[in-house]
From Swiss-Prot:
Family note: Belongs to the maelstrom family.
GO process terms (BP): germ-line stem cell population maintenance; male meiotic nuclear division; negative regulation of DNA-templated transcription; oogenesis; piRNA processing; regulation of miRNA-mediated gene silencing; regulatory ncRNA-mediated gene silencing; spermatogenesis
Location of the region described as Disordered in the Swiss-Prot/TrEMBL record: 415-440
Reported function: Involved both in the piRNA and miRNA metabolic processes. As a component of the meiotic nuage, plays a central role during oogenesis by repressing transposable elements and preventing their mobilization, which is essential for the germline integrity. Repression of transposable elements is mediated via the piRNA metabolic process, which mediates the repression of transposable elements during meiosis by forming complexes composed of piRNAs and Piwi proteins and governs the repression of transposons.
Location, primary (coarse class): cytoplasm
Gene designation per UniProt: mael
DNA-binding region extent: 2-69
Species this chain originates from: Drosophila yakuba
This protein's name: Protein maelstrom
One Pfam family from the record: Maelstrom
Domain of life of the organism encoding this protein: Eukaryota
UniProt-annotated location(s): Cytoplasm; Nucleus
Amino acid sequence: MAPKKHSGFMMFVNEWRNHNAEGRRMTLAQAVSHCGTIWEKMTTQQRGPYNSGAKDADVADRGKRERLNCYGQGIAQVDLAHKEAAESLMHMKRTTERLVINAKKSYDLENAKFVFATFNYFTKALTTDVYVPAEFAACEYSLKEGVRSIYSTMIDPGQIIFGQGSDALHHSSTTHDLPLPPNALGEKNMAKLYRNIVCYLTKCQGADKPLIVFTPTENIAMVNSCFRYLECEDDSGDGGRKIQVFDIQYLLFILKKAVMDVAGLNDEKINKFVTDAFFKKDFFEFTSGIACQYHEDNDRTKYCTQSMVTRWAYTFSDFMCGDLAITVQPGKHIPAETKPNYRIICSDASSLAHESSFESFYSCPGSRVKKETQSEDFSLSSSQISVASRSYTPTDHTSFTTDLTKVCEFPSLGMRKSSKHTGPSVSTQRERNAGAWNLPAHSRSIQKYSDNDFSVTDSVRKLKN
C-alpha cells in the first residue's frame, strides 16, 4: 500500500495547535472541525505556504524510504546480510588457518586437537532459521591419538513448533527415527544440557581458548541455530563463552596441505574440490558398532550423530595418517573390526591374472591384495567357476550355415564378375540344415509339383483308382 501524502490543511491544523493554547487542549478531531471553517475563509495566497510545505514533506519522506528488490526486501538490509556473511566466512577461514599454522610451527601438528560436532533436529521453522534439536554428539580428535573422547546425548525439547507435527514426523521417519515430543528421549533441561556441552568443550580445548567445533558446510546454519536454541534457556551467565561453528571440510583441506608439506610430499594436486570429494564419499558409512544403542537397534546408524562424528574422525585418519607414518589403531583411527566382503574370481587370460583390478587401499593393515599371493587366496567356489569356464565350448545355434568366405555364396550386384555355379544338392543341404536347431529335417525328398497336384478333383480321382 502506497504511503499517504501530506495535506496542506493538516499542516495548517498542526501549526494552529502548536501556537494556540486552546488548540493544545483539543483533540485532533476537534481541532480539524475548528480549523475547517478558518481554512474555507483563507485565500489561495494564504494557503500557499502550507501546500508547498506538504509537498516538501512528501519529497523528504520519499528520500528516506528504503529501496526494495523484486522480493520486497530492503536492498540495504540484503547488502548488509551479504557483507556479514562474507566477513563471517573470512573469519572462519583465517581462524582455521591460524590453528593449523600454529600447530605446524610448534612441530606438534599430529597432536593438535579438534572437536567435531553435529545435531539432529525434529523440524525447522518455515520463515526463520529456528531448528528444534533432537540429538547432539561431539568428538575430540587428533591425528596421533585418533578419537580421544565422545560426548553424545538425546534431547527432549518438550514440544515442537505448532502446526509442524506432520513435517517433524516425516523428517524423523526418513532420517534418525527418534520419537517426537512428548515421547522424546534424552535430556529435558535445555539450560543444563548447554552447560554440560560448554563444560565438555572447555575440557577439550582449555579454559583460555575459544570454543570451536567443526561440522560439514551444509550443517553450519543448523548447528548454530541449535546452539542458540539451547543457549536461550541458560540464565546462569555461562553464555559469555560463545561456541563458534566452523567448516570441517575447509579444515580437512588446510590440514591435508600442512601434513603433506611437513612430510615433504608434492601437494600441487590437492585442492578444495579433491578434499571435499574425499570427505563426501563417506567410506565408513555402513560401519557397525560406532552408533548409539538406540540407532544400532533400529538400524539407523547412518543418521546417528555419534556415528557421524566418529566417521569423520576415521576419514581424517584414513586421509592423512599415512603421510605422517602414524600407525593406525583399531577403534581410534579406523573401525575396530574390518570385514572385507569381496571375492576374487580368476580370469582365463594369464595377462588379466597378473593385472588384477582389485588392488586398492584399505585402512586395515594387511588387507591389501598382493599380486604374488593372488593365486593362493582363491576360494574353492572361485576355482570351480574358473575350471568350468575353461571347459566350456561355445556352440553356434544359428540357422545360417553357409561359408561366408566364399564369393560364390553371394549374388552379384553388377560390379562383380558373374561365375557359373550350381546350387548345392538336396542331400548336401539336408546335411547342413541338420545342425540347425530351428530347421526340421525333410521327411521326404524335394520334388517339383504342378497345379494339378493341389486340385481337389484330381485328388478324388486318385483315391477312387
